[in-house]
Amino acid sequence: MKTLILHICIFALVAFASASRDSAKKIGSQYDNYETCLTELSVTEDELFSIGEVTSGQHKTNHEDTELHKNGCVMQCMLEKDGLMTGADYDEEKMREDYIKETGAQPGDQRVEALNACMQETKDLEDKCDKSLILVACVLAAEAVLADSSEGA
């Protein structure tokens, strides 16, 4: 079963490297619990942000707070079902392990360092949905920057 590291996504948190290349895909759509979380939260796929929107930061300026929260709750649901989060708390070690497994990154890799930085940046946020979306957005944005810099090298 694939896990979301924001997907991390996003976690997702998340074959993020490959998912971020397909900017039209919805965040989290490649993971096993995607449909389950949409159903449980009464969210339609049309309400979810695309990976491109999140990577570029457009999700923060083009959408209402309720849409941001809804998207975050879907991310949190998937993270929790994959055992990466309980409520608003991350299992940081499991996130790292699953991220390394999904991406093939190694400890010390810039992608793992980006995940660590994103977890650190969001660790004190109390709202589990907001925290999840911000984490996924942070990881996706970092991966996009790293992919751009490696393509330019």
Swiss-Prot record:
Q: Which SUPFAM superfamilies match?
A: Insect pheromone/odorant-binding proteins
Signal sequence: where? 1-19
Its GO biological process terms?
response to pheromone; social behavior
Coiled-coil segments: none
Q: Which residue pairs form cystines in this protein?
A: C37-C77, C73-C129, C118-C138
Q: Where in the cell is it found?
A: Secreted
Record-level Gene Ontology MF annotations: pheromone binding
Q: What does this chain do?
A: Colony queen number, a major feature of social organization, is associated with worker genotype for Gp-9. Colonies are headed by either a single reproductive queen (monogyne form) or multiple queens (polygyne form). Differences in worker Gp-9 genotypes between social forms may cause differences in workers' abilities to recognize queens and regulate their numbers.
Complexes and interactors: Homodimer.
Protein name listed in UniProt = Pheromone-binding protein Gp-9
Q: From which organism does this entry originate?
A: Solenopsis nigella gensterblumi
What are the leading ranks of the lineage? Eukaryota, Metazoa, Ecdysozoa, Arthropoda, Hexapoda
